[in-house]
Amino acid sequence: MKYELKTTSGNARRGRLTFSRPKGEYVVETPAFMPVGTYGTVKGMTPEEVAATGAQILLGNTFHLWLRPGQEVMKSHGDLHGFMQWHGPILTDSGGFQVFSLGKLRKIKEEGVTFQNPISGEKIFLSPEKSMEIQYDLGSDIVMIFDECTPYPATFDYAKNSMEMSLRWAKRSRDRFDELQNPRALFGIVQGGTYEELRKISVEGLVNIGFDGYAVGGLAVGEPKEEMHRILEFTTPLLPQDKPRYLMGVGKPEDLVEGVRRGIDMFDCVMPTRNARNGHLFVSNGIVKIRNAKYKTDTTPLDPECDCYTCKNYTKAYLYHLDKCGEILGARLNTIHNLRYYQRLMAQIRQAIEEDRFDDFVVEFYAKIGKEVPPLQSEVNK
């Protein structure tokens, strides 16, 4: 993987990731949003439909694909690309966050994490080394280190111990990744909770080990938005300029804009797909809750500014009808639209950075959805 920083507008970065794959070179323009394909599918969508929304890279879940269908099935198809028939780049998470989500069903030790398989109930063990091996078999283009996602709230001591263990796990991940002679990219993950000094130590430790990119982890786990913005604004300037930066599991359209304002290049979130299935649709001036009875007779498209298949062909009344009847097509059309909304947003962001008018774009974006522009920490401190 190669990263090229092309231009900036304030702290916002316009770049390009290039991946060499068996079927040729693939380019990902950044800032980029990655749709989530937890079980090797973006729910309800074919790979061609996902690509048609403008997505250039997907996210897969190591933890879920390891438990089902397992490494052997994956290897029998070549890798995850062959299994799901998506030939572009794939980033896989390490399984750390899913294990974190199991709560009382897991036990964290220095060696790794023992937990109860949520499918079969049997005890299984996941370590940094095992995570690297699974991701190697998945053929991931971007492999994430195995870390502990520090919960919120966490005391300073808990966050410190957790971050220090994540650094030791980062080194073990790096060592096993190198032993496997994996030609792909490996990203480090910054932890440290909401404590700036811990975030700084985490960044220094990761940069010392050396990675192809850096993710900011342990955010969007329940902390207030202001806290997330503060930590992001503190952390991103510490990261190497010549490597991509990834904000994990975030989020709403506003979160993407705020992340880019603070120097983030990559995002993923289940929000556009999950919300689509619940009739919660993102449009240029905010949100349409398609289950609202006022749409029953509405013959206008979802978003007149949108060029997706759904908006070009169907009315709000039809989408309301499909949802009311529980038709699968409703969820599919909604998903096509939400994913296209996110990709259009990223394209607009990239263009604004190229034209060095990103600050103006931010003002326009918030004006459209009827919200105030949140101040940057640097502005608050003036």
Swiss-Prot record:
GO CC aspect terms: cytosol
Textual note on the cofactor: Binds 1 zinc ion per subunit.
Active-site positions on this chain: D93 (proton acceptor), D268 (nucleophile)
The entry's keywords: Glycosyltransferase, Metal-binding, Queuosine biosynthesis, Transferase, tRNA processing, Zinc
Highest taxon of the lineage: Bacteria
GO biological process, one term: queuosine biosynthetic process
Obligatory cofactor(s): Zn(2+)
Biological role stated in the UniProt entry: Catalyzes the base-exchange of a guanine (G) residue with the queuine precursor 7-aminomethyl-7-deazaguanine (PreQ1) at position 34 (anticodon wobble position) in tRNAs with GU(N) anticodons (tRNA-Asp, -Asn, -His and -Tyr). Catalysis occurs through a double-displacement mechanism. The nucleophile active site attacks the C1' of nucleotide 34 to detach the guanine base from the RNA, forming a covalent enzyme-RNA intermediate. The proton acceptor active site deprotonates the incoming PreQ1, allowing a nucleophilic attack on the C1' of the ribose to form the product.
The name this protein goes by in its record: Queuine tRNA-ribosyltransferase
Organism of origin: Actinobacillus pleuropneumoniae serotype 5b (strain L20)
